[in-house]
């Protein structure tokens, strides 16, 4: 046996590890570049929601296509195109409902450190607040259909599959969730998006189905749209959605939300299969 192989057993592994990170970063930058370019062109013809939809769809879909082509595996394996049990939907809904309060408080703590500019806050509210059924359906299509499909195919599909090939299951999930948070660019969203990305990654890994991630992503995005659209004018003084003051979630509600989330996640874990999706088995074997 060559002595150099004994002295440097990990030398050959360094290149694929570097390529794994580089590949994820290149896909992210490609998604940004193409997305911003497409949104810039669309802005001449469409409003804010339209340009967001075009940029998101074009950028992420193109990078997903590139990622699948370079993965050297069938698209069904890379993207985990497999159904999941409908019995998982109830715990997913409960996780999304309770988890929204927890992640909202993470955002509040972030805002205490780094205040959100009022113009940016108004932009967020403009996306989430719908006046009338037609606007609600438009925003629901963007937040609970288009975004979950394109973002899950990219991050829990191509990127996570590639990272798992290099780093193994849970490290691949962790790195892909960080990429998901960074992709959102805005600091007030990045921390929460990273946490949500980790949860979505675990769900896809446990079930072996990208559709589980899409469903959870859609449910999670739908809750704030419903709440802000329905109760925007009914919030008590000091708790308005456009208030300049950071209002924290009450501690009893946080404790209740934490308990519900733990119960729902435990139920999901029990009902979901172990990570035995063929694509992930091959990925970890590589």
Segments and roles (model prediction):
Residues 1-18:
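Short, Lys/Arg-rich, polar N-terminal cytosolic tail immediately upstream
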Residues 22-29, 53-54, 89-94, 137, ...:
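Hydrophobic alpha-helical transmembrane segments
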Residues 30-72, 91:
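Alpha-helical transmembrane segments in multi-pass membrane proteins
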Residues 33-40, 177, 189-246:
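Functionally important transmembrane alpha-helices
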Residues 48, 77-147, 165, 238-240, ...:
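Juxtamembrane helix-loop-helix connectors linking adjacent transmembrane helices
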Residues 65-76, 203-206, 262-269:
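Structural signal for the C-terminal ends of transmembrane alpha-helices
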Residues 150-175, 202-209:
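Membrane-interface helix/loop boundary segments of multi-pass membrane proteins
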Residues 218-286:
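C-terminal membrane module of polytopic membrane proteins
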């Amino acid at each position: 046996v060559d002595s150099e192989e004994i002295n440097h057993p990990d030398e050959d592994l360094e290149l694929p590890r570097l390529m794994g990170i580089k590949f994820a970063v290149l896909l992210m930058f490609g998604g940004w570049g193409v997305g911003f370019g497409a949104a810039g062109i669309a802005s001449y013809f469409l409003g804010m929601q339209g340009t967001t939809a075009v940029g998101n769809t074009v950028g992420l879909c193109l990078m997903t296509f590139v990622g699948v082509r370079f993965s050297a595996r069938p698209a069904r394996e890379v993207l985990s195109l497999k159904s999941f049990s409908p019995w998982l939907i109830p715990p997913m809904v409960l996780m999304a409902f309770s988890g929204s309060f927890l992640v909202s408080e993470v955002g509040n703590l972030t805002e205490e450190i780094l205040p959100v500019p009022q113009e940016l806050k108004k932009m967020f509210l403009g996306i989430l607040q719908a006046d009338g059924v037609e606007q609600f359906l438009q925003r629901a299509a963007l937040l609970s259909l288009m975004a979950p499909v394109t973002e899950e195919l990219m991050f829990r599909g191509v990127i996570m599959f590639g990272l798992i090939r290099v780093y193994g299951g849970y490290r691949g999930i962790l790195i892909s969730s960080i990429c998901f948070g960074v992709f959102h660019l805005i600091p007030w969203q990045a921390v929460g998006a990273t946490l949500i990305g980790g949860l979505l990654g675990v769900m896809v890994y446990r079930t072996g189905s990208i559709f589980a991630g899409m469903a959870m992503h859609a449910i999670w995005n739908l809750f704030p749209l419903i709440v802000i659209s329905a109760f925007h004018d009914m919030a008590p003084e000091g708790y308005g959605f456009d208030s300049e003051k950071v209002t924290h979630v009450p501690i009893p509600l946080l404790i209740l939300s934490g308990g519900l989330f733990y119960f729902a996640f435990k139920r999901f874990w029990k009902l979901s299969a172990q990570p035995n999706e063929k694509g992930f088995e091959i990925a970890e074997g590589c």
